[in-house]
Amino acid sequence: QKHITERMSKDINRLKVVLAEKKRTNKWLAEQLGKDPGTVSKWCTNTMQPNLETLVEIAKVLEVDTKDLLWSIKDNK
């Protein structure tokens, strides 16, 4: 049980990193998606995760592959 909890506390998405690479802000992304900036902020801190449909939208807006928005499970041990 402890192992599962530790795994869940690790970062899942790379949104903050990708936004920085693209020189874009949380606010810009929120506007593009029609989402609340507070929600996008929670995604960036991995407090919450976007659903899969939203992840695809984010990838399109940022012109990246969806896999670029997620940390590799292999690297996240």
Map each language-model feature to its residues:
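The alpha-helix within a helix-turn-helix
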Residues: L19, A30, A59
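DNA major-groove recognition helix of helix-turn-helix/homeodomain DNA-binding modules
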Residues: E53-D68
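Short amphipathic recognition helices of helix-turn-helix/homeodomain-type DNA-binding modules
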Residues: D68-K77
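A short, Lys/Arg-rich alpha-helix, primarily the initiator
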Residues: Q1-T25
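Short alpha-helical DNA-recognition segment
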Residues: K23-K42
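Residue-level signal for the short linker/turn that defines the boundary of a DNA-recognition helix
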Residues: R24, P50-E53
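Residue-level detection of the helix-turn-helix DNA-binding "recognition helix"
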Residues: A20, G34, T45-T47, K74
